Amino acid sequence: ADSLDWREKGVVNSIKDQAQXGS
């Protein structure tokens, strides 16, 4: 689960970053 933890956080961070930058 730890291996996916950084992946999930990275994906969420990327989406949040794009959403803020896109908006």
UniProtKB/Swiss-Prot annotation:
Q: What sections of the sequence does the record tag as coiled-coil?
A: none
InterPro entries in alphabetical order: Papain-like_cys_pep_sf (IPR038765)
Specify where the region named Disordered lies, as residue ranges: 1-23
Name the Enzyme Commission number(s) assigned to this protein: 3.4.22.-
Biological process GO terms, please?
Answer: proteolysis
Give GO terms: molecular function aspect only.
Answer: cysteine-type peptidase activity
Output compositional bias ranges, type Basic and acidic residues. 1-10
Q: Which UniProt keywords apply?
A: Hydrolase, Protease, Thiol protease
Family, according to the entry, reads as follows:
Belongs to the peptidase C1 family.
What this protein is called in its record is: Cysteine proteinase
